[in-house]
From Swiss-Prot:
Disordered: annotated span: 308-408
Species annotation: Dictyostelium discoideum (Social amoeba)
Stretches with biased composition (Acidic residues): 322-339, 347-373
Domain of life: Eukaryota
Swiss-Prot/TrEMBL keywords: Repeat, WD repeat
UniProt similarity note: Belongs to the WD repeat WDR55 family.
WD repeat intervals: 17-56, 61-100, 104-141, 144-183, 186-224, 227-265, 268-308
UniProt-listed PANTHER family: WD REPEAT-CONTAINING PROTEIN 55
InterPro entries for this protein: WD40/YVTN_repeat-like_dom_sf, WD40_repeat_dom_sf, WD40_rpt, WDR55_POC1
Entry protein name: WD repeat-containing protein 55 homolog
Gene3D superfamilies found in the cross-reference section: YVTN repeat-like/Quinoprotein amine dehydrogenase
Length: 408
């Protein structure tokens, strides 16, 4: 890919090409490694760098499409899920298949997400299963959706959210083995989801190109705004207020949540749909795979650096933006829609159209957000000593944790 002359800060590894459409992409949690799976059941482990991209492992664990390949939290294993309904665990050093669950689901598995020793899977008929990989057993399962599970995201240590082709999003407490909430069905398939605002907001991409923002504590409270000419298939978090979106129009956008603005265009895969995106362990490279049979790297370090420098002022900025929201509404019609954007100046952004313009709702939202921002300001200066002790104990416990596959 093209690189800038401004030094290594703007450089990125070269593109990687494939012989078939790649299905999933994930970066290693501690090393410069990434794994890609494809439509023919293969997976490849790459070591990436500015000099070259080296294949460290190549195998075909499934005879049908390998829809997901994801690293364990310690980076020692790769979990895979396939359209053949099976799930496998692979040692990244040897390529050995350590564990196979042939009938993990009754229908093809579409999603797989891991957190610590827990794995969450979703299939084509709407079933979600929670696995404890220390025991290689199912903890619980949920059947709340009537169509395929398109995406699963972790909210915190107890909760996950899932989107479905039936147009709904749901939240589960996998510790209590219960569903917390499920939304009404939207008119379009929901294809991707992301947890933002310290877990208080769920951002979901839809088939018609709009983005739905749900209140995590009340899924009936949803804001919808247009923004993409085609479906939003992939979302990656930058911070609690910004994210990257990948669309079927081939463009990767950088978007602000509050206020809703297009902050930049990262790049594009020509006009080929973007299948998946992921961020590297150091937040330097965004990886994207597409129907153009390629993996592209984008140097996005500056996006994260800018957002980190703005975090200290975010509460004040959000409060000011909320106070001025009514004035900004008058100018919305004059601002170009995000779908027409091809180039964006770094110091400017286009407002994204909001389909929810009810004044009473806006006033209520402003009061809630202002109250939330004030809470942030009050809580930020001090650190709870009891909480600090709990965190330290948790770290010690994690350091003592043995590998959950030691007996295999």
């Amino acid at each position: 890919m093209d690189t800038s002359s401004e030094g290594d800060h703007e450089l990125a590894p070269n593109d990687i090409s494939f012989n078939t459409i790649p299905f999933s992409l994930n970066f290693h949690p501690t090393e410069d490694l990434l794994v890609v799976s494809d439509a023919e059941g293969r997976l490849k482990l790459f070591k990436y760098s500015l000099d070259e991209n080296e294949v460290k492992l190549s195998l075909r664990p499934h005879q049908s499409g390998c829809r997901q390949a994801n690293f364990s939290s310690d980076g020692k294993y790769i979990f895979t899920a396939s359209s053949d309904c099976s799930m496998k665990v692979i040692d990244i050093n040897t390529g050995s298949i350590l564990y196979t669950r042939e009938e993990a689901h009754d229908y093809p598995i579409n999603c797989l997400v891991s957190k610590e020793f827990m794995v969450f899977t979703g299939d084509d008929e709407g079933t979600i299963k929670v696995w404890d990989m220390r025991q290689q057993n199912i903890v619980c399962e949920f059947q709340e959706h009537g169509d395929f599970i398109s995406d699963i995201t972790t909210i915190d240590d107890r909760h996950i959210a899932a989107t479905s082709g039936d147009g709904g999003v749901s939240i589960y407490n996998f510790v209590r083995k219960s569903m917390d909430d499920i939304s009404e069905k939207s008119d379009n398939e929901l294809l991707s989801c992301l947890s933002l605002d310290n877990g208080q907001k769920l951002v979901c991409g839809s088939q018609d190109g709009s983005i739905l923002i749900y209140d995590r504590n009340n899924l009936e409270n949803v804001k919808k705004f247009a923004g993409h000419p085609q479906s939003v298939d992939a979302l990656v978090k930058v911070n609690n207020n910004t994210f990257f979106s990948g669309s079927s129009d081939g463009i990767i956008r950088f978007i602000g949540l509050r206020p809703k603005k297009l902050l930049g265009v990262v790049g594009e895969h020509s006009t080929f749909p973007i299948e998946r995106m992921a961020i590297s362990r150091d937040n330097r490279y965004l990886g994207s795979i597409s129907h153009d049979f390629s993996l592209k790297f984008w140097n996005v370090a500056s996006f994260y650096e800018e957002d980190e420098s703005e975090d200290a002022d975010s509460a004040n900025a959000n409060a000011n933006e909320i106070e001025n929201d009514d004035d900004d509404d008058d100018d919305d019609d004059e601002i170009e829609d995000i779908e027409n954007a091809t180039k964006v100046d770094d110091d400017s952004g286009s407002e994204m159209g909001d389909d929810d313009d009810d004044d009473d709702d806006e006033e209520q939202e402003e009061e809630e957000e202002s109250s939330s921002d004030e809470d942030i300001k009050r809580k930020k200066p001090q650190q709870n000593p009891i909480k600090a002790q709990q965190i330290e104990k948790q770290k010690q416990k994690q350091n003592q944790k043995r590998s959950f596959f030691k007996d295999l």
